[in-house]
């Protein structure tokens, strides 16, 4: 039987507009996911809707407005471009974007693959280089929840992660080298990954190991002292312990140790988004400067750069063999 192949690329998602209604809807779906917030539903869901969302939505709207572009959210723009460039790489495949939260959803993407395109082989590529139960596993949860509604389903190839993929490592290394050439050699390079609660690591999530794998492989290709590289973790919220060191704490501390020139890259983000453009490029830059830092450069995510599209294409080809 001739293979009719479909590919779904999946990222976390984004509000459709930088207003309270859209942001609240998005955050409600995101923060209701037990993979993300693994505490008692009996306590969390009422607290989420009665207290947390009204306050968080208001604050988040202002943050989104800082990074919003005329064509929409940076994450959506980047993701749609990634899809379009992958279509050029695989003109005979059906390729859709399926966000974990918000639209276009995984549900709609799978429906197209089965009902419209009639694919018999489906590749799911979560756009998270390092596996975590909070991201990659949540995508798999959603895929399974949707796929069980259909009588006839395609063969499914689920790509767990690509933390050690040579093309990905080369792409990240290339971004760092380009920034060094453009902005000069920094005194310190910060590799900031999204943080997760320590409890998730203790319970078996190998996310921290996968981040370390990426860091080690990038440094093996980078002519830069390992003593001048710090791996840290961002986007902490809540009162429970998260993996450390925390990016904002590292960045505030460095100037006090005489480090006044740093560059920051976020290798775990395949597309620039709120966490990179606002939290790192704006918030953490201000933290660094307020504490006496002089030069701060954020190294952009791979987005839909030529090297990234080729990297993603190679990952897909590898799983087609």
UniProtKB/Swiss-Prot annotation:
Per the record, the GO terms for biological process are: heme biosynthetic process
- Residues at which Fe cation binds: 194, 275
Answer yes or no on keyword Metal-binding.
yes
One GO cellular component, as annotated? cytoplasm
> Which pathway is recorded for this entry?
Porphyrin-containing compound metabolism; protoheme biosynthesis; protoheme from protoporphyrin-IX: step 1/1
Q: What are the record keywords, sorted?
A: Cytoplasm, Heme biosynthesis, Iron, Lyase, Metal-binding, Porphyrin biosynthesis
Which PROSITE patterns does the record match to this protein?
FERROCHELATASE
The Gene Ontology terms for molecular function here are: ferrochelatase activity; metal ion binding
Where it sits in the cell: the answer is: Cytoplasm
Metal-binding recorded as keyword: yes
Transmembrane stretches, start-end = none
Question: What's the main place this protein lives?
Answer: cytoplasm
EC number per UniProt:
4.98.1.1
For this protein, what reaction is catalysed?
heme b + 2 H(+) = protoporphyrin IX + Fe(2+)
* A Pfam family annotated for this UniProt entry: Ferrochelatase
Q: InterPro entries recorded for this chain?
A: Ferrochelatase (IPR001015), Ferrochelatase_AS (IPR019772), Ferrochelatase_C (IPR033644), Ferrochelatase_N (IPR033659)
Q: Which family, according to the similarity comment?
A: Belongs to the ferrochelatase family.
Its biological purpose is as follows: Catalyzes the ferrous insertion into protoporphyrin IX.
Q: Which PANTHER family match?
A: FERROCHELATASE, FERROCHELATASE, MITOCHONDRIAL
The record's section on NCBIfam families has: hemH
What's the name of the protein? Answer: Ferrochelatase
């Amino acid at each position: 039987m001739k293979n009719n192949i479909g590919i779904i690329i999946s990222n976390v998602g984004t509000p459709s507009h930088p207003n309270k209604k859209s942001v609240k809807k998005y955050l409600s779906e995101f923060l209701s996911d037990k993979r993300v917030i693994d505490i008692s539903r009996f306590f969390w869901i009422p607290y989420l809707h009665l207290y947390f969302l009204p306050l968080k939505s208001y604050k988040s709207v202002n943050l989104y407005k800082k990074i919003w572009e005329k064509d929409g959210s940076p994450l959506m723009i980047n993701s749609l471009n990634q899809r379009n460039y992958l279509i050029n790489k695989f003109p005979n495949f059906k390729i859709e974007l399926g966000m974990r939260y918000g639209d276009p959803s995984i549900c709609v993407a799978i429906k197209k693959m089965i009902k419209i395109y009639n694919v018999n082989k489906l590749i799911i590529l979560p756009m998270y280089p390092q596996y975590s139960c909070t991201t990659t596993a949540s995508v798999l949860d959603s895929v399974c929840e949707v796929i069980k509604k259909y009588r006839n389903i395609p063969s499914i190839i689920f790509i767990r992660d690509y933390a050690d993929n040579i093309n990905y490592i080369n792409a990240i290394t290339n971004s760092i080298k380009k920034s060094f050439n453009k902005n000069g050699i920094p005194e310190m390079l910060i590799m900031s990954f999204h943080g997760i609660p320590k409890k998730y690591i203790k319970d078996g999530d190998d996310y921290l190991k996968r981040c370390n794998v990426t860091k080690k492989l990038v440094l093996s290709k980078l002519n830069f002292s390992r003593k001048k590289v710090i791996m840290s973790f961002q986007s902490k919220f809540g009162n429970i312990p998260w993996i450390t060191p925390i990016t904002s704490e590292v960045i505030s501390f460095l100037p006090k140790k005489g480090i006044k020139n740093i560059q920051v890259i976020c290798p775990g983000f395949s597309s620039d988004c709120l966490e990179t453009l606002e939290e790192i490029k704006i918030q953490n830059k201000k933290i660094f400067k307020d504490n006496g830092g002089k030069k701060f450069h954020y190294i952009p995510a791979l987005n839909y750069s030529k090297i990234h599209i080729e990297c993603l294409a190679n990952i897909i080809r590898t799983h087609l063999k």
